[in-house]
Regions:
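Positively charged, low-complexity intrinsically disordered leader regions
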Residues: 1-28
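Short beta-strand segments enriched in small/hydrophobic residues
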Residues: 31-40
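Glycine-rich phosphate/diphosphate-binding loop of Rossmann-like nucleotide-binding domains
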Residues: 39-54, 135-146
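Glycine-rich loop at the start of a catalytic domain that most often binds anionic cofactors/ligands
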Residues: 46-53, 79-81, 106-109
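Short beta-strand elements in bilobed, periplasmic/extracellular small-molecule ligand-binding domains
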Residues: 56-71
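Non-catalytic terminal and connector segments of soluble metabolic enzymes
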Residues: 58-60, 83-86, 112-115
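Short, well-structured alpha-helical segments in soluble
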Residues: 76-88
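Anion-binding alpha/beta catalytic cores of soluble intermediary-metabolism enzymes, centered on
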Residues: 95-146
Length: 146
C-alpha cells in the first residue's frame, strides 16, 4: 500500500494550475474568476471559504467573496446569485453550505447557473456526474476518487 502525501499532491496541482493561468495571460485570455458567497459567520464555513479564496490567490485566479448577514432573506440571496450568474466577469460560483434554516439550500443550488456551479451540486450537473458525462465534480469526492 502506498501512502499519499496530500501536501505534495496539493502543491503539484497548484503548480500545474499556476502554469495554466500564466498561459492564459500570455495568450491574452481572461483570468478565471471565482465568486464565493458566505451567508452568516459560522466558523467552519469561514475557514473553508477563506481557504478557497487563498487557493485562488496562490494560483493566480481572481476571487470575490460576498459576505451576507445570516438574516438575509432568501429572495435577496437569490437576487445576489442572479447578479453573479449574469456577470460575464464571473466564471464560477460557490455558495457555502449550510445556509441558515430560513433559506432553502435546494432553491439556492437550483438558482446557480449550471455552467458556473463549481461545486457540481446543481441537478443538471449532478445528473451529468451520475451519467459519467463531463461536468464539475464536487471537490471532496473527486479528491477521494483520484
Amino acid at each position: 500500500m502506498q501512502i499519499l502525501d496530500g501536501v505534495l499532491v496539493s502543491q503539484a496541482i497548484k503548480d500545474e494550475l499556476k502554469i495554466k493561468v500564466a498561459q492564459l495571460v500570455t495568450e491574452g485570455k481572461k483570468v478565471p474568476h471565482l465568486a464565493a458567497v458566505l451567508v452568516g459567520s459560522e466558523g467552519a464555513s469561514e475557514t473553508y471559504v477563506s481557504a478557497k479564496v487563498k487557493a485562488c490567490s496562490e494560483i493566480g485566479f481572481k476571487s470575490t467573496l460576498t459576505r451576507l448577514e445570516a438574516t438575509i432573506s432568501e429572495h435577496k440571496l437569490l437576487a445576489v446569485i442572479e447578479e453573479l450568474n449574469t456577470d460575464p466577469e464571473i466564471d464560477g460560483i460557490l455558495v457555502q453550505l449550510p445556509l441558515p434554516k430560513h433559506i432553502s439550500d435546494a432553491r439556492v443550488i437550483d438558482a446557480i447557473n449550471p455552467a458556473k456551479d463549481v461545486d457540481g451540486f446543481h441537478p443538471e450537473n449532478a445528473g451529468r456526474m451520475v451519467q459519467g458525462l463531463p461536468t464539475f465534480l464536487p471537490a471532496t469526492p473527486h479528491g477521494i476518487m483520484l
